[in-house]
Amino acid sequence: MKKVLFSFLIITSAILAQAQTKSVTLDLLGSSGIAGVSFDSRFKGNHGFGYNVGLSYAYGTGTLSSYSVNGIGIPLEINYLLGQRNSHLVLGLGMTNGIYKYSANSFIIGYGDDATEIKPEETSGTAWGYNFFGDIGYRFQKEKGFTFGAGIKPTFTFDNGKINGRWLMPYLGFGISF
């Protein structure tokens, strides 16, 4: 994991010296969870390959075990803008890493005399978490000015090396390119 992040940082920093379109956006849902701010840049021009780095806030709850989670994440994405003018098909792959606080009420069946009694037990803490996502969307982006994006991000979470969650996360983004 550290090698992947280190390689990503080396590649993106080497490319920053080239002329490219950059944008800053307010992101709602998608890889941001609830909301986030991201910086996007093309490797060259206003289309083709680029990257997206952000800061996001996520919050979620579950109903079966009174589960809740919230925290700050850093979405990283490599993407491709297909289209020559201002309208683009966005295709991308990425990962969100973050620190999250969680709490859960689980119900444990007791032993011995309490065999039929269900006792609530609360678990809480802070943990590092991550997910992987794809990006399929539309982006309106001029070389300078208003930018808008909308789409779907198929998202996968893991536990002990196995997929334990998958969602189709819609997203919206509004910002400015420069």
Placement of each model-derived feature along the sequence:
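Generic cytosolic/nucleocytoplasmic N-terminal low-complexity/intrinsically disordered segments
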Residues: 1-2, 43, 78, 152
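Bacterial Sec-dependent N-terminal signal peptides
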Residues: 1-22, 178
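Generic structural signal for short, solvent-exposed loop/turn connectors between secondary structure elements
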Residues: 13-22, 29-34, 85, 160-165
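A generic alpha-helix preference that emphasizes hydrophobic side chains
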Residues: 14-16, 36, 133, 171
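Short glycine/proline- and aromatic-enriched beta-strand/turn motifs that initiate or cap beta-hairpins
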Residues: 19-73, 175-177
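Outer-membrane beta-barrel transmembrane domain signature
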Residues: 66-178
